[in-house]
């Protein structure tokens, strides 16, 4: 609900509870903290396609750490309203081991950041079945489809990449 803080661990919103497989019943309790200030007027800092590769590969991780993140921090400090981030996908560039690099640097901003999955965030080795390609993303960043209320706005974050295909030579169909 909009009048409560968005539960987060560092920069990562945690608006969900994982449901264990093979259980007949499951209870998820959420602790809601009232907001200290209204979020009716808020600011979104939006970025897309950082496509981070591992350090020393193409300098994308270094550029994200040394240029992009300091710029976001500077921008964030100059804004008086509550700030939230939205990452529009392709957080990494096909390297599943780089999610911790992204998270470590995003945590430095001190701002809840909502993530949307991109085609390069999918596990490229499992692309014949779309549902298999999101496992690593979900382990690090959470669900691929979710929503959040900030102020009077309801934000919806949707995985619009459909990777089911007949063979590995085909590209993804939508997104």
Predicted regions, residues:
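Extended active-site neighborhood of metal-dependent phosphoesterases/phosphodiesterases
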Residues: 8, 96-175
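N-terminal active-site segment of His-dependent metallophosphoesterases
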Residues: 5-99
